[in-house]
UniProtKB/Swiss-Prot annotation:
Family classification: Belongs to the RimM family.
GO biological process per UniProt: ribosomal small subunit biogenesis; rRNA processing
Keyword Transit peptide: no
Keyword annotations: Chaperone, Cytoplasm, Ribosome biogenesis, rRNA processing
Family matches, as NCBIfam families: 16S_RimM
A Gene Ontology cellular-component term: ribosome
Protein name: Ribosome maturation factor RimM
Endpoints of the signal sequence: none
Assembly: Binds ribosomal protein uS19.
S-S bonds: none
MF-aspect GO terms: ribosome binding
Localization terms from the record: Cytoplasm
Gene coding for it: rimM
Organism expressing this protein natively: Salinispora arenicola (strain CNS-205)
Record remark: domains: The PRC barrel domain binds ribosomal protein uS19.
Amino acid sequence: MLVVGRIGKPHGIRGEVTVEVRTDEPETRFAPGSVLRTEPGANVPASPGAYRVPSELTVETARWHQGRLLLVAFEGVLDRNVAEALRGTFVGVDRADVTAPTDPEEFHDHQLVGLAVVTSAGERLGEIVRIDHAPAADLLVLRRPGDRDVLIPFVRAIVPEVDLAGGRVVVDPPGGLLDL
């Protein structure tokens, strides 16, 4: 599953929820009628008789809220209590349904996660475990030996090469970046 958003808190009493967007194509992914898969294991109730998050949610409406969040209504989610049960659920699409980017310098998160990170001299630094989307630039989260994570700005000056076929990302970090 390619994660396109994370459901946040309910908004109002009619079942709308806030969604933290994790896609470059929110207008497509959250269009009315779009079917989104929920994270594996999301349908485990907190207690017997509690609302079970379905394996799929269908978007009824979506609109921007405060410029950074989407307010989304899903079919069948009609009140605040059910909306509250969705809080924290990741929603996504099947990777098979995602078209490859046409720009050779554009990548989907799932293409980068798991790649080895090496210096231009060939020294292995670790592995990419996730991508954080910050306002200024995306950040590669590099897992170093010893389970220590380092954030690397995904900009050409620091990441001159992405070799998907070779399973690696070449970095040229400025002094001290890997020590943070």
